[in-house]
Amino acid sequence: MGIDAGTTATPRTLAEKVWDDHVVVSGGANEPDLIYIDLHLVHEVTSPQAFDGLRLAGRPVRRPDLTLATEDHNVPTIDIDKPIADPVSRTQVETLRRNCAEFGVRLYPMGDAEQGIVHVVGPQLGLTQPGMTVVCGDSHTSTHGAFGALAMGIGTSEVEHVLATQTLPLRPFKTMAVNVDGELPAGVTAKDIILALIAKIGTGGGQGHVIEYRGSAIESLSMEGRMTVCNMSIEAGARAGMIAPDDTTYEFLRDRPHAPKGAQWDAAMRYWQQLRTDPGAVFDTEVYLDAASLSPFVTWGTNPGQGVPLAAAVPDPELMTDDAERQAAEKALAYMDLRPGTPMRDIAVDAVFVGSCTNGRIEDLRVVADVLRGRKVAPGVRMLVVPGSMRVRAQAEAEGLGEVFTAAGAEWRQAGCSMCLGMNPDQLAPGERCAATSNRNFEGRQGKGGRTHLVSPAVAAATAVRGTLSAPADLD
């Protein structure tokens, strides 16, 4: 990787700088560039065929030291000392363990102190660093862009290519600037920013782009908040999301297990501090959000772009002028069993899920505990609080958060993807409605027939207490 990210004569965006520093072979105008990959993250769902391909070709993993695996999607979040009940899930986890042992890849298995969701584990260990290229066979790899890394999800054939070569053929992406300036009102969070953005530009608004999030409201976010924003870039159709590193980034990384130390830290800092979009650099697209105008946000439909402020009502498809939008809304409302004009705050839930690679970090759990402290989960509501990693769980326990959750009547679980997706035992029953801090509200995402409303941790906690979609201010 070069050290001249800020010294070129032509103004460049942050994404262009990281890209240029990783071009092994330029493809010119007609072919993809060959891009070097600094960190490859692996889990049990998208890797089995990739390892099989290596085995059939007689190839090793080229850089096992730059590869990390963890078990997250299929693992249960209770009784983790017992065999996994579902045979498909059990096979995938056992296959990952065999593959990692055979190919010399680091693995954090279920029960390990460092196990957790891959996009929580990488940053907390200091493996994710500014200026890196990061890939994983998982859509939400964009999370790591919060550190100024170029991070993206890839398919299984690409996973095999990276395992074998530590490179990936890619064509340059378009660039989009999302400018969020102003001060966020009290109770408005990073999750509300990204849900509002997706509602504004649509689930295809960022297609083919790398989004750079900029502006005073973004700069004021913690690293956890920045990861939440970048995590859902894919829900806006983008290939990746990035935020330029700054003092908040450096303080988060300092003294992490795999962060540079001593003179290496000083050298890294000199490079990292150049990772900013140059004055005069041109983005293909620019979008603006006024932070002061934002409020707690919630989805009503079956894609992340179908969202409104919590203070609003379920929209009426008949008032939509675009035919495709109207038809999608009608279909979504039928699945969600909602009526136009219903105030969002009147919608009752059966379950609340706190967790996922979007909102399963310690800051998220602190927010939830602050709301739940001294209160009880509403009768008839099931609440799952699932830490994004065992390290997050240990920290939450040390801070007494686990006791707050259980005292309120919530289920305090072990680490994993859990109810974000129907690949493990934590699922909704058909017809159940859930307020979830995760990232996708597709039909059946949390279990066949389940209905999902995407919310922030603060809204999730307040909803659990009131039993209807609510913000903490509604509890006063």
From Swiss-Prot:
Alphabetized, the UniProt keywords read:
4Fe-4S, Amino-acid biosynthesis, Branched-chain amino acid biosynthesis, Iron, Iron-sulfur, Leucine biosynthesis, Lyase, Metal-binding
Report any Pfam family annotated for this entry.
Aconitase
Per UniProt, the enzyme's principal EC class comes to lyase
- Which cofactors does this protein require? [4Fe-4S] cluster
Question: Which one of the record's GO molecular function terms can you name?
Answer: 4 iron, 4 sulfur cluster binding
Q: Which reaction does it catalyse?
A: (2R,3S)-3-isopropylmalate = (2S)-2-isopropylmalate
Q: What does this protein do?
A: Catalyzes the isomerization between 2-isopropylmalate and 3-isopropylmalate, via the formation of 2-isopropylmaleate.
Q: State the superkingdom.
A: Bacteria
For this entry, the protein name equals 3-isopropylmalate dehydratase large subunit
